[in-house]
Amino acid sequence: MGKIGFFSETGNNQKYPRDFPNARTEVAWCIALDAPMCHLQKLPDEHFDLGIVIVPKNNPNIDLEHIRKVCDKIAIMQEGPHWYFQDYELPNQFHYYNNLLEADWVYCHNESDRSYYEGLGCKDVRVMRSLMIPEGLISRNEWGNATIIGGNFVSWYGGFDSYIVARQLGDPIVAPSMGRKQEQENLIEDIQYLPYMNWRDWINSLSQFNIGIHL
């Protein structure tokens, strides 16, 4: 494909080191492809054959034509479950949808996601699976009996479904504290919440549990 750049609201027009502590999927792909993470508005001076855009979770009103100033082709990369944009206010749902159609193609995580985006009318949908950079991660070294659920009680993470299944196991239940955690979750008596962590700390912590459930 040639020269690739990623674009997100957290981009600073620089590349990440391989030991970056918060290497979530989009950052991991930057590292694997030796590509910079660029800002959505403050464009870099260099030009790219392909720009891969991560639409901000809370502010989807991005301008693809602005990014095309420095990219020959534009792809939108799936962020979260494929239907998450339906939690936006109505105008933003249509804005997000229009951006999907305006992109040269869409990168999704799984074949099931591909079918969804094709059903929306996207002209070219390709699978770009979640990626993890393993360097520096701690192998499992504690064998506890607790069950970890994979997210909080919002549609993005499906925490309620995971919680109901975890209760059937009869073991202690632990949950992460994500950015969308609701305050009332602390009132659930049989869940112990971990503090908010960067990606590397979360993965190292996750590896210590007996069972993980994410539905």
Q: Which role does the model predict for each range below?
A:
Residues D63, H95, R200-W202:
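Short acidic active-site motifs
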Residues R18, I133-W199:
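Conserved catalytic-core segment of nucleotide-activated headgroup transferases in glycan assembly
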